[in-house]
A protein has these predicted regions:
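Beta-sheet ligand-binding and adhesion/scaffold domains
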Residues: 34-36, 46-47, 61-109
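Bacterial N-terminal signal peptides
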Residues: 7-17
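Sec/Tat signal peptide C-region and signal peptidase I cleavage site
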Residues: 19-23
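Intrinsic low-complexity, repeat-rich intrinsically disordered segments enriched
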Residues: 43-56
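Positively charged n-region of N-terminal signal peptides that target proteins for export
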Residues: 1-5
Length: 109
């Protein structure tokens, strides 16, 4: 195998792995199985109730306090990325039910 081919294959492998790693982040538009929508961009979120607020962001998780005027006001919502296309959230205490979120097919307007 020539050195050029080996270098090219190595470079392609590195680029593919980098691209996959960047796609695996919680940022984006999310739709719940019960018709709710939210959008996360860094530390900003558009909540299911439509309010734009800030929360605590990490690459694979996000949490925020439910704003006034929305169901469960002042409760904490934790969102965890389970895969590139699946996230789970829990609002309130640890024994509260989980809500399933999937990446939306189109953006939130």
């Amino acid at each position: 195998m020539s050195i050029r081919l080996l270098v090219a294959l190595t470079l392609i492998g590195v680029l593919l792995q980098t691209g996959i790693g960047r796609a695996d982040a919680i940022d984006g538009d999310w739709c719940s199985t019960d018709g709710m929508r939210m959008s996360i961009s860094g530390e900003k979120i558009t909540t299911p109730g439509g309010k734009q607020i800030r929360g605590n962001y990490s690459r694979h998780a996000f949490d925020y306090v439910v704003p006034e005027g929305e169901a469960g006001s002042s409760e904490i919502v934790n969102v965890i990325l389970r895969s590139e296309y699946l996230a789970m959230s829990r609002q309130g205490p640890a024994d509260s039910p989980l809500r399933e979120w999937r990446r939306c097919k189109e953006g939130i307007s």
